[in-house]
Amino acid sequence: MTQVLRSPSEFQAWRRKQSGTVGFVPTMGALHTGHEELIKQARKNNDLVVLSIFVNPTQFNDPKDLEKYPQTWDQDLAMAERNNVDAIFFPRYPDMYPDNYRYKVSENEYSTLLDGAHRPGHFDGVLSVVMKLFNVVRPTKAYFGEKDFQQLTLIQGMVESFFMDLEIVPVPTVREEDGLAKSSRNLRLTPEERKKAPAIFKAITNSKTAAEAAASLSAQGFIVDYVTDVGNRRFVAAKLGEVRLIDNVQI
């Protein structure tokens, strides 16, 4: 039976009674098989598995995007129970931000590129909430998908910079059969948009250059924020209708 704990103090009281290793999967809910893969990895390698569900307002720079973020609590709980998750931490905004976000964690170089250039303040919100979650949960290992590769890299950097005693475990992107990266935002695509969406993965995989991939997507009706090569990885963000999709591949 999965325990559901609402406040940091309630969770910490539970956590103090536990022994052994803790695998942690932080999420914003609307769970899909990509999240399930993170949970399975955590289950395989730890004594206890903790899942958090918190739609974090400080990482949304568009209030409409926050309002439209899908919430699927019953399905999320069913997935947690199916995968033997020991506890779900399911806090509210005042629980997580007693300071109303006066204190924050920020990184001032890599967080300004790629998604950071298009979503001001986004990564401050991500790093701040993840730091809070790590402090409450005190995990041995925390699991993050490579789909959000920039986020993963920034969190790894934060853990190293602040000497945090846990291991970050990257998990490869889980894709639909047609190549589209699994994402909670995919639920918001219309049937027509859903048919078009795999073009993102095809463009960044098959194009010789980032510019060629961007041109291909624009020609197919996507509004492209960026296609950029950084090191040995190609990153993309593009809008299809109302939905902004991101992906990346090794090149």
Curated annotation (Swiss-Prot):
Other comment: The reaction proceeds by a bi uni uni bi ping pong mechanism.
Keywords: ATP-binding, Cytoplasm, Ligase, Nucleotide-binding, Pantothenate biosynthesis
Gene Ontology molecular function: ATP binding; pantoate-beta-alanine ligase activity
Top-rank EC class of the record's enzyme: ligase
Gene: panC
One GO CC term, this protein: cytosol
Main localisation: cytoplasm
Transmembrane parts of this sequence: none
Binding-site residues for (R)-pantoate, renumbered to this chain: Q59, Q151
Function text: Catalyzes the condensation of pantoate with beta-alanine in an ATP-dependent reaction via a pantoyl-adenylate intermediate.
Name of this chain's protein: Pantothenate synthetase
Species of provenance: Bdellovibrio bacteriovorus (strain ATCC 15356 / DSM 50701 / NCIMB 9529 / HD100)
Localization, UniProt: Cytoplasm
Residues reported in the UniProt entry to bind beta-alanine: Q59
